[in-house]
Structures are given as C-alpha cells and as structure tokens.
Amino acid sequence: MLSRPRLSAYAAFAAELDAKDPDFTTITVFTDKEETGSDGNTGMQSLFLKDFIEDFVSAYGLSARHVLMKSVCLSADVNAAVDPAFGEAFERNNCSYLNRGPVVSKYTGSGGKYSTNDASAETMGFIRTILEKAEVPWQVGELGRVDNGGGGTIAAYISTHNLDTVDIGVPVLSMHAPLEITSKADVYLLYKAILAFYMSPMAKE
C-alpha cells in the first residue's frame, strides 16, 4: 500500500513515455487546482488545452474543434473505495474496492449527477472494449451513495469542448482524510489501462 498524491499523474506520465509508435496522436495534460475549482492558467478551466491543440493541428490544415470532436479523453482521477468503517456512505453494489483494478466512472458529482460529466453509452463501450481486449482488470464505481456527498472531477470541464470524456482512476480508502490508502496493484493496473488506451488501434466511430 502507499499514499496517493499524484498517482494519476504518475500513471499517465509513465504510460505516455511507454507508448511507442501509437496509431493515433496521444496527448497527456497535467493540471492543478482541481480541489479549488480548476481556475487560473494552470487549471483545467483555462484555455491552454484548446489553444495548444489549435496551434498543433493548424500546421496540418485541421480545425481544433473537429479534432476535439473526433477524440476521446480519459480523465485520470481517484475514486472513493468502500470504507467498511463508514459503510452507510456507500452503495456497495455500485462502488469501488481496493485491489480490483482502476475504476471507470460514467459520472461523478454530488446530488446525483450535479456538477459532472456524464459519459455516453458509446464512449463507455469504447473504453470497455479497449480494456477487455488488453486484459486489464477494471471495475465500475460511483463516488458514494447518491445524494449523500460525493464530488466532481475535471471531466466536466474537458467535455465542454465536445470531447468524449470518461473518468478513470484508482480507488482510495479514506479519501481526503489525513491518511489515504491505495493499492500498488491498482496503480499498476491504471498505468496498464492508460497505456492500452494510448496504444489501441481502435478509432472512435
């Protein structure tokens, strides 16, 4: 077990480094201030991503908005694992557990689907197919019982660019507590999941 600071960034960075000759262009973006609104020029609400892609694709005579619409994004962020000490806060059949692989979340947010991205069934199927073909163990989970707390991710901001986005991350025991616990196996499998996504020959339809 290990503590979780920057686990998602580590897994994504390691996968980007190991993605040799992918069929499609891969981009890994690191942002901060996620816990305080994702504001500022280094938060996900900045124009950096769109401006970067616009500059990048214009050299090929392409439109940034068309490239974004044809892309798929994994928003790497942790998810709350079922805590046996606070079982009433979780819907056990819809939440994640340690040592079962990364969590793929159709939606996060609080109060049901408030302040969230809601991935389409087609996008969920696209990611599921990639992970299953790569034989990467994974699980589906939500951030606690509906209408009982919860939290959002930057997927809500990414998806405003008409970019299909899905949350994925390791489950965390006691998220936001002074001591958080994750599984090294889940961290490794998150790396494998992101690498499989980067290296997949599948194109979005």
Positions of predicted regions on the chain:
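Generic hydrophobic alpha-helical scaffold/packing signal
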Residues: 53-57, 128, 195-198
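Phosphate/oxyanion-binding active-site loops and adjacent basic polyanion-contact surfaces
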Residues: 4-9, 49, 119, 190
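Short amphipathic alpha-helical face segments that pack within enzyme cores
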Residues: 7-15, 126, 189-192
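A short glycine/serine-rich beta->alpha loop
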Residues: 1-3, 34-39, 112
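Short, conserved micro-motifs enriched in small and acidic residues
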Residues: 2-10, 181-184
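Active-site-adjacent substrate-binding region
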Residues: 79-86, 90-179
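His/Asp/Glu-rich mid-to-C-terminal helical/loop segments that flank catalytic regions of hydrolases
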Residues: 16-28, 170-205
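Acidic/histidine-rich catalytic neighborhood of metal-dependent amide-processing enzymes
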Residues: 10-103, 150, 202-205
